[in-house]
């Protein structure tokens, strides 16, 4: 059974997540004044405090069969344009079953004239009006672009009134300033396998009012290429190369004609792109937005992106260009909803029961967050869950700037190691526990022995932290591939123990050295940890300096004043050991590396006091400080630099 463009386009749109306008919206505005559904439009203006906004008009795809799908067009990519600072005008047009061509392009022209005639009413800056559409909306958008200034045109015996006289703003211009065509049908004479006309029941036959093959003049009149000249606006054309509805060649023909006239900025081919799915993606949306911004003389911006830690297909939380995070929570019966992300943010409830808020800018990298619903702290079901803060939490990932991004991302051209979970029964506690072990690329076949970094998490976390939140394997893979770090094994134990040193020496090291090909001397061992794990590292390495040649302490230090929850929390027994033999420790520890997340790090004052005492004793150490507080972005960076100092 033949599937129409309309049905496939509708199905494709159903797969896309809806954006929601923020404020200043006008719905079902009658741009002609005749009360017809096909003559309604919606206006969405950004809620950014600006008095006016440049405009982008949206046209839906429906094979010209629908007269009321303007909401679908906005759901497709209207929010992206709104986020980029444009006022968005999503329009209906008459269906092909109620009015034949050129009624649809006349509707588009009338809507644009209405926008210009009412610019001050809606706060629209009509010095720039862009237009975009998908499928049949791509056709109408393209036709609107190539017919700037065209009132009528004759093709053979057919004279076509392109402009029309609809509405009361006939003296306004219907010209557009830039066009993005998403997989629109262009040449109706080559819709069947890029060779010939489709049959007499095709959507294009319906809008023409007869079989395409019998109406070649009208086919030419519908073809945007029939009107191309060097005065047309610039175009961006986007098409998936596996589109089963509108042949990919349609955009090839169109792009070539535009390029020949100097009117094509780019033709984007989406590999394996379908009629909507795959072709619609964050990258192509970004390209569309930046194209319109360039043409409008605006600064290019980066669109809000779903957090990399969202569950599949969840749009929120979204990360804005400046590091702020947008949240949406569907909780219609809740009385109060908050986001706990470094601080509490009250959310605002909409009429649809959806709560929203935008946070302050967050630093790069991973951050825990919670939902607080009527006073109950819970993980967000839209996010992956992580064990932190002594409970299962949610996480949001803030993109790194370009100069750091390569450190923390998977790369196709890098050989990757493996992280394995090993279950074992502790000889110290009798409990069954886990240890996560990273082995570098090539470990399985090299036959070599490797040094080991024993790497500990912080309080409220467990053995999963460095692998999941810390990206240990990615950091080491990239450093090793670049020759900046020696190939090494990394062992990540559960540090929630009454006697960590006993478990490390009795369980951890023997297990790793018996199951893996390791170096078994101090020269082949390093010990490091963050926060609580940093104190465990200090205590263990100072009491057993003969076992480790490299020591790393991240965002940690003994307390300036004794704490009741931790034995020897002020570190006095360990200071005494160091004071007895500073030269010995300086010789034993080839690298004693201390890092801190700046003044905002909760361990900063403790660490500062500890380092001052080290200096008084003559204990040599390296110190690195980076802004970010007591957070995983700081600890990832600590590992990144510490790993480069090991086993050399």
Name each model feature, range by range:
Residues 1-7:
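Positively charged n-region of N-terminal signal peptides that target proteins for export
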Residues 9-19:
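Bacterial N-terminal signal peptides
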Residues 21-23:
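Boundary at the C-terminal end of the N-terminal hydrophobic targeting segment
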Residues 29-32, 38-39, 46-47, 54-76, ...:
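Non-catalytic cap/lid and distal C-terminal segments of serine-dependent acyl enzymes
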Residues 150-176:
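A conserved active-site-flanking secondary-structure segment within enzyme catalytic domains
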Residues 301-328:
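Extracellular ectodomain segments of secreted/surface proteins
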């Amino acid at each position: 059974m033949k599937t129409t463009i309309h049905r496939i386009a509708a199905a494709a749109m159903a797969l896309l997540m809806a954006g929601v306008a923020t404020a200043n919206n006008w719905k079902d505005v009658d741009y002609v004044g005749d009360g017809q559904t096909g003559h309604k439009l919606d206006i969405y203006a950004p809620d950014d405090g600006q008095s006016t906004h440049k405009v982008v008009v949206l046209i839906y795809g429906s094979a010209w069969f629908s007269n009321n799908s303007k909401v679908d067009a906005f759901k497709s990519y209207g929010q992206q344009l709104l986020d980029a600072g444009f006022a968005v005008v999503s329009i209906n047009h008459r269906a092909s079953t109620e009015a034949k061509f050129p009624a649809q392009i006349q509707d588009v022209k009338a809507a644009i004239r209405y926008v210009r005639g009412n610019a001050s009413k809606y706060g629209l800056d009509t010095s720039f009006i862009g237009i975009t559409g998908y499928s049949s909306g791509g056709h109408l958008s393209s036709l609107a672009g190539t017919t700037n200034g065209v009132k009528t045109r004759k093709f053979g015996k057919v004279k076509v009134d392109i402009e029309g006289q609809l509405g009361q703003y006939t003296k306004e211009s219907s010209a557009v300033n830039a066009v993005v065509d998403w997989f629109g049908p262009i040449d109706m004479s080559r819709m069947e396998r890029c060779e010939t006309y489709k049959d007499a029941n095709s959507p294009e036959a319906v809008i023409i009012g007869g079989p395409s093959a019998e109406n070649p003049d009208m086919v030419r009149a519908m073809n945007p290429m029939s009107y191309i000249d060097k005065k047309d606006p610039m175009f961006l054309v986007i098409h998936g190369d596996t589109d089963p509805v509108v042949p990919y060649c349609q955009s090839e023909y169109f792009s070539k004609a535009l390029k020949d006239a100097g009117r094509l900025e780019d033709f984007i081919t989406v590999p394996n792109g379908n009629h909507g799915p795959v072709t619609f993606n964050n990258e192509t949306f970004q390209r569309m937005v930046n194209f319109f911004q360039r043409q409008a003389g605006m600064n290019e911006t980066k669109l809000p992106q779903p957090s990399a830690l969202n569950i599949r297909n969840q749009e929120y939380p979204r990360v804005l260009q400046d590091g702020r995070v947008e949240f949406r929570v569907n909780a219609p019966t809740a009385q109060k909803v908050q986001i706990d992300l470094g601080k509490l943010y009250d959310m605002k409830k909409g009429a649809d029961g959806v709560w929203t808020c935008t946070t302050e800018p967050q630093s790069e990298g991973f951050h825990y967050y919670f939902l607080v619903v009527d006073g109950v702290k819970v993980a967000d079901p839209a996010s992956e869950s992580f064990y932190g803060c002594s409970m299962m939490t949610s996480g949001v990932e803030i993109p790194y700037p370009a100069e750091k991004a390569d450190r923390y991302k998977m790369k196709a051209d890098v050989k990757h190691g493996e992280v394995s979970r090993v279950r074992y029964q502790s000889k110290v506690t009798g409990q069954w526990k886990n240890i996560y072990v990273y082995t570098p690329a090539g470990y399985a076949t090299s036959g070599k022995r490797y040094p080991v970094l024993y790497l500990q998490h912080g309080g409220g976390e467990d053995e999963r932290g460095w692998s999941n939140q810390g990206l240990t394997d990615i950091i080491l893979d990239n450093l090793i591939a670049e020759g900046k770090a020696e190939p090494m094994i990394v062992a990540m134990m559960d540090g929630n123990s009454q006697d960590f040193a006993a478990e490390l020496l009795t369980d951890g090291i023997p297990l790793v050295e018996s199951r893996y090909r390791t170096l078994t001397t101090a020269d082949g061992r390093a010990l490091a940890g963050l926060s609580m794990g940093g104190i465990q590292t200090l205590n263990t390495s100072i009491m057993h300096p003969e076992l480790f040649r490299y020591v790393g302490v991240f965002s940690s230090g003994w307390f300036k004043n004794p704490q009741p929850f931790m034995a020897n929390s002020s570190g006095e027994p360990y200071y005494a050991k160091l004071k007895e033999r500073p030269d010995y420790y300086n010789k034993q520890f080839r690298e004693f590396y201390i890092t801190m997340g700046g003044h905002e790090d909760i361990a900063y004052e403790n660490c500062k006091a500890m380092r001052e005492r080290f200096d008084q004793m003559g204990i040599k150490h390296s110190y690195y400080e980076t802004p970010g507080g007591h957070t995983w972005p700081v600890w990832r960076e600590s590992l990144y630099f510490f790993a480069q100092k090991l086993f050399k």
